[in-house]
Structures are given as C-alpha cells and as structure tokens.
C-alpha cells in the first residue's frame, strides 16, 4: 500500500508541511478567513514589546543615511552591475513598486509596511530583480539597524535616487513601521496563474477593489492590453488603474513621464532562460530569484521582463528628453530581443547611450504605454503642456511622486523627520489643529447629561458615534471620527448613515455644542467631533446601567472639526460602506457573502475576532441596526447592554430556518414551531463558525455578562480612538 497522501477530491498527491497535510482552507475552501484578524502580532515581531519606532527614528542621523545612499548609487557591484554606472533608476523602480500596490478602494497595499520583502509581492513578475535592489540596500540597513525601517528605507532610497540624478523632490515623511510576515488580508485577485486576468468581466470591467490589469503586475501590461500593442486601448487600462490608485490624468502623465525619464527596461534575451522567482528558488540562492542563464545573466545580459527600452538620452539625469522624443519622432512597432512588443523611432539617429558600452548608441525606444501619452487625447494635451513647460512638469512629478509614496500613511501628524514638507495637501485629509482649551472631567459629565436629555434616543446617539468612527481604515489610516466629517458631504448622505435621522441627531448635538461654547470661559470649547463620540459614550453607559452594570466609557477630548475646503468629496466617497455587519447593514455591489464583508471590515478597523464578537453582541443588544431592523436583536430588553444576543443564539431549544426574505433566517421554537427572532447571515455566523461560536460561548454563560460588558466597552473605545494618533 502506498504511503503517499492523496487529495480526496482530485486524487493528486498532497504535500506535507509544518501546518499539516492539508490546511482547513484546503478541506473547506468556503470557510471564512478569521486568520486575517490575527496578523502582525507580537508572536511574529522580533522587536521588544516596548519598541517605539518613532522614538528610534528621531535618534537617526538622517543626513548620514542620505549620504550613504548617494554613495551607493554609483558604487556598482560585480554581482549586479549598475546600468549606466548608476543604481538610481533601479531604486526609483523599487520604491515605485513598493508604493504602487496601493489601491484607494480599500486602502490596502502601498509601501507603508515593507511588504515588498515578503510573498507574494517579492515574487510578482512585475517585481523581477527588485530582490537585487533590496540586497544592495542591506549594508545601509545593517549599518543603521532599527533606527530606520525597511519600509522607510525603500522609499527614502527612491527619493535619494531622484535627487542624485538632479531632480528636486517634494519631501519625505518617515514613520512606516515594518511588518514581519506576509499580509494575508489583501485580495490580489481570483487568478491562480501569473499574468492571468480573470478579474475582468463585461466590457473590460475590472473587479473592485483591484487596481492592476493582471495577476502579478503593479498597474498595466507595458506591451498593451493582454500583450496587444494598442496605445489607445492601453490608455483605457492606464486611466482605470491609476484612478484606482487615487491618481488623476495629470498625476498619471507626470508619474509615467517622470519615471521613464530614467533608466531602462531589460529584455536582452529569451525570458525562458530566467530561473524561478525568489519564493520558488532553491535554498542555496538565499532568497534571490530570477537567476538567468542567458549570457552572464546580468549587466548587458539582464532580463527583467520582455521589452528592451531606454527612453532618454540622459537616463541618469533629469531632463525633458522623454517628451522631446515622444513628440519629435514617429514610431514604428518592433520586438525586443526577448520577443516583446515595443516601439522604435523612425528615421532617428543613434542618440541613446548603451547601459554598459560607452562606444555604442541606440535609436530611441518606447513602450506601448508610453505612446498612450501621445495617442490618448486627454493624455496628449497634458503631455504637450508639460513638454512646453518643463518647470510645471517637474513640479507635477514631484507632487505626484510624493503622493504615490505617502498615500497610505494617513494624516501628516504621523510623518516623521525634517524633510516633511510644510505644505499640507488635501489628499492627506487635514483637520484643524486644536486651538482652544479642552473640556475637563466636570464638563464631560455635564455634557453627557445634556446629550441624554436632548430627546435623541441613546441607541441613535450610539449609531451616530459608530457611523462617524467606523469609517476608519487601518490600511491607509483614513477615516475615523476626528474631523466630524459625518456632517459633511459625502458622508452625511450615505445610505448606511440614514441621512434623515442623522440630520436630526446632528442638529441636536450642534445645539448642545453652541450652548456650551457660548457659556464656557477661559477659551474652553467642545468640538462637534468630540461631542459625537461623547454621545456614544453616554449612550453605552446608559445601556450598561439599564442592564445593571455601572461603567464609565473612556473618553479623551482633542478632536477638531474639518471644513468643506479640507474635504475632497470624491476621495472620501470610497469610504462609504457597501456593508456594515456591525449595524446589520447590507448594501449592493459586493458579491461576497455578508459574513465575509463583516470580516473584511473588522480587519480594516484592526479588530480581533474577540473584539468583533463583543461589538456585534453589544450593537445587537442596543438594537443599533440601520433602519431599526430587528434582525439579530435577540432580546426582550433592547437598549440594555445584556449578553442576550449570545444566550439566545446558542439556545438549543430553538432552531434556525431560512425565511422567505433572501438572506434572512427565523428562530423557531423546536416544539411549537413559533417564530421568536429573525437574523441575518452576519448574526448566524457567530453560531455557525466553530471559532466564532467558541467566542460567543464565552459571553453566553451565566457568568459571562460582566466580561462581555467590559470587553464591549474596551472594543468600543478602541473604535472611537482608531484615528487618535496623538494618543499613541
């Protein structure tokens, strides 16, 4: 009898691993992924529990780091020689590709955690040979150690590379804290093979929130859509993918033209001669991949992708040659030595330097996506303006590069270092600085009483506080209660926020605010942002008291109120929840199951599974559902902070059955068949999923209510303070 393990479905051999023969996900692929809620913990982090990266960075000699990086740019190594004797373009590409995974749809990706070091990003086809760039950086990282993270160093190297090639950057903000394991919470696409594009449907409709055209690419295929060399069709892909990275047409042109002012692509020979990516490479290669057997495998023989293109006459010096060449020549289609589509200038002289032979020159070459900057009418208009106004182009590229490399860092208050620009930009979601004396403990107590006396139901106060704070995304540090943007477009009009009810609550809170501020002395004021959160605190305390528990919900003032001028409506529109399981709200447009959407939102809010469980139980006890729906409100005492949700969910005297309404279930008495409660899939998953049921059982015991109330208050406070970076 063979001892080889076989997959029970396919009959194929399975591979044993430290996790077991088959993972649970292999056996049950539809199982929800709670693991994404428990990543990046102290168990994978080698730093001390009290390690403070911001404090360490402040001790760094940043000038010395920059000097070392500048020296590195021209210190060509035999094991991976520098094109044109300068590593600048390689480090620009490394930083660009680290940041360029960002997508505005869910805020995930980006350079903020150093994820390019790990799978899958370290082995994406589009990141070929960036492993060499990071190895070139190792001596600098080794020298300065924990004072600068890999995430910061990779972006800084890109900035220094640009500066070393004569370009003036807009600035640099540090503060990116390294993670120590691959991020399992990012959906990169449905494909199971590199460069596949199952993400499209209909008339090239790209699945949300994806922001690249194929699996393993950062943005678009440089040869054109699916390798078809059509610049106009490529422009459509470019516009869509860059927009999903929060870039408009002008920023897109600036980034492409600015980035392609430098360096070259590498398609010296047959790509079939390139070895496996880092994650598939043999152990003796020590994490390096793409080892090529074509010639020397490096230098003039390097193969990174397919095209072999050098865009400008001075590939290691800032210039306007990109636009000169784009518009001064006509272009004909050709193929690289690797067989990839590219374009060569007609009737042009040999004016482009060779990367390794000073005696050789080449004709200008371009990618299909470069010609999009000329063939697409909107891109062409911008390109010609930049061509005629080099200073405007330089400023646009500097700003777009800064945005590219900082878009996932959140507010400027998180930036570290002396190179942070003084100018605040609207995409940083600015809020005013505190310019008044904050309320004290006596004021807080008095305001709570006034808020509860407004006539607004406590549950509605809690819903408003939740709607304000739960927009936060830990992915790109956007959203949250600070700024009180719930009173502004677009948030005030979101369906999940029940605009008509919200307007009543805000009017009542604004009256309390106006009365307090008019009567306060000594420059003391309360912001509406603080008052919204305080209303939630008062509501939770009242609900706990109604259940027989005396609690104080922690509250720290210090939020301010943003203005319309500080709020980019289009940028904030992406924060609108398509679903919010905590409020039992399910909108349209997301094909995932409601429970999957709940887990996704919990992960964006940096919640653990126990925190998520406590919050669901508490919100249901409050009756805090959108539209006043009764689904999941398994209690005869709505508004009291009891553990009834868990007790009744787990009651084996009852059974659940699908209702006539899609997505709704009925809880019936097993003997009489009478319907007692209704629920959604979000509610039922806490009894269905074994891990969530185990958590529900903790709170559903006779002695579980006190622990539940304590844990709910802690989780609630965490949500209210997710964007309070000043408290960290």
Swiss-Prot record:
Top-level taxon in the UniProt lineage: Bacteria
Family the entry assigns: Belongs to the peroxidase family. Peroxidase/catalase subfamily.
Chain spans, region Disordered: 1-20
Signal sequence interval, chain numbering: 1-19
Enzyme Commission no: 1.11.1.21
Catalytic site positions: 97 (proton acceptor)
Cross-link Tryptophyl-tyrosyl-methioninium (Tyr-Met) (with W-96): where in chain: 219-245
Record HAMAP family: Catal_peroxid (MF_01961)
Role noted for this protein: Bifunctional enzyme with both catalase and broad-spectrum peroxidase activity.
Protein name: Catalase-peroxidase
Cofactor binding remark: Binds 1 heme b (iron(II)-protoporphyrin IX) group per dimer.
Pfam families from the UniProt entry: peroxidase
Post-translational modification: Formation of the three residue Trp-Tyr-Met cross-link is important for the catalase, but not the peroxidase activity of the enzyme.
Catalytically driven reaction(s): H2O2 + AH2 = A + 2 H2O; 2 H2O2 = O2 + 2 H2O
Subunit structure: Homodimer or homotetramer.
Positions marked as site (Transition state stabilizer): 93
Residues where heme b binds: 260
Keywords annotated in UniProt: Heme, Hydrogen peroxide, Iron, Metal-binding, Oxidoreductase, Peroxidase, Signal
């Amino acid at each position: 009898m063979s001892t080889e393990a076989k997959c029970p479905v396919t009959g194929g051999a399975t591979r044993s691993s430290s996790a077991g023969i088959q993972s649970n996900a292999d056996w049950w692929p539809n199982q929800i992924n709670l693991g994404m809620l428990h990543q990046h913990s102290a168990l994978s982090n080698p730093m001390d529990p009290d390690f403070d990266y911001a404090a360490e960075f402040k001790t760094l000699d940043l000038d010395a780091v920059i000097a070392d990086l500048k020296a590195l740019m021209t210190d060509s190594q035999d094991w991976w020689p520098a094109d044109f004797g300068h590593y600048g373009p390689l480090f620009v590409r490394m930083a660009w590709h680290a940041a360029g995974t960002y997508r505005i749809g869910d805020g995930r990706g980006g350079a903020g955690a150093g994820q390019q070091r790990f799978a899958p990003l370290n082995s994406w086809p589009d990141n070929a040979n960036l492993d060499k760039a990071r190895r070139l950086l190792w001596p600098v990282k080794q020298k300065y150690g924990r004072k600068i993270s890999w995430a910061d160093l990779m972006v800084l190297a890109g900035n220094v590379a640009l500066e070393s090639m004569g370009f003036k950057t807009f600035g640099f903000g540090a503060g990116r804290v390294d993670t120590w394991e691959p991020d399992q919470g990012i959906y990169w696409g449905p494909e199971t093979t590199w460069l596949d594009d199952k993400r499209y449907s209909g008339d090239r409709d790209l699945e949300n929130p994806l922001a690249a055209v194929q699996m393993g690419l950062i943005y678009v295929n440089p040869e054109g859509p699916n390798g078809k060399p059509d610049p106009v069709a490529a422009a459509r892909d470019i516009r869509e993918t860059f927009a999903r990275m929060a870039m408009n047409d002008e920023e897109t042109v600036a980034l492409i033209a600015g980035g392609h002012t430098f360096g070259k692509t590498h398609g010296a020979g047959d790509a079939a001669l390139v070895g496996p990516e880092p994650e598939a490479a043999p152990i003796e290669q020590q994490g390096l991949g793409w080892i090529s057997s074509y010639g020397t495998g490096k230098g003039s023989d390097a193969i990174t992708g397919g095209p072999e293109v050098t865009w400008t006459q001075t590939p290691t010096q800032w210039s306007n040659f990109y636009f000169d060449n784009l518009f001064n020549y006509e272009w004909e289609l050709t193929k690289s030595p690797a067989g990839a589509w590219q374009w060569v200038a007609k009737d042009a002289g040999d004016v482009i330097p060779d990367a390794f032979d000073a005696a050789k020159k080449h004709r200008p070459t371009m990618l299909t996506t470069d010609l999009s900057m000329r063939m697409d009418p909107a891109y062409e208009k911008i390109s010609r303006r930049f061509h005629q106004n080099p200073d405007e182009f330089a400023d646009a590229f500097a700003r777009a590069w800064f945005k590219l490399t900082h878009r996932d860092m959140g507010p400027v208050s998180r930036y570290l270092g002396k190179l942070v620009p003084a100018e605040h930009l609207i995409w940083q979601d600015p809020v005013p600085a505190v310019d008044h004396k904050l309320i004290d403990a006596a004021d807080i107590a008095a305001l709570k009483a006034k808020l509860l006396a407004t006539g607004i139901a406590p549950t509605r106060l809690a819903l408003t506080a939740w709607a304000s704070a739960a927009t936060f995304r830990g992915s790109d540090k956007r959203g949250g209660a600070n700024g009180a943007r719930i009173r502004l477009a677009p948030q005030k009009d979101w369906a999940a926020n029940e605009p008509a009810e919200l307007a009543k609550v805000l009017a009542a809170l604004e009256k309390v605010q106006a009365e307090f501020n008019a009567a306060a002395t000594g420059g003391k004021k309360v912001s509406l942002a603080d008052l919204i959160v305080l209303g939630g605190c008062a509501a939770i305390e009242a609900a706990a008291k109604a259940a027989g528990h005396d609690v104080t919900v922690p509250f720290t003032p210090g939020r301010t109120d943003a203005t319309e001028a500080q709020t980019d409506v289009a940028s904030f529109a992406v924060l609108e929840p398509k679903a919010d399981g905590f409020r039992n709200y399910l909108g349209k447009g997301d094909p995932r199951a409601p429970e999957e959407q709940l887990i996704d939102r919990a992960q964006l809010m940096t919640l653990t599974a126990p925190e998520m469980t406590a919050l669901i139980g508490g919100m249901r006890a409050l009756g805090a559902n959108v539209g006043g729906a009764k689904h999941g409100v398994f209690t005869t005492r709505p508004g009291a902070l009891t553990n009834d949700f868990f007790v009744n969910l787990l009651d084996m005297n009852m059974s659940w059955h699908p209702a006539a309404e899609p997505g709704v279930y009925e809880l019936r008495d097993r003997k009489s068949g009478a319907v007692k409660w209704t629920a959604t899939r979000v509610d039922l998953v806490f009894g269905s999923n074994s891990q969530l049921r185990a958590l529900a059982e903790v709170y559903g015991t006779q002695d579980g209510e006190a622990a539940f109330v304590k844990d709910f208050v802690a989780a609630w406070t965490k949500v209210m303070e997710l964007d309070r970076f000043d408290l960290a």
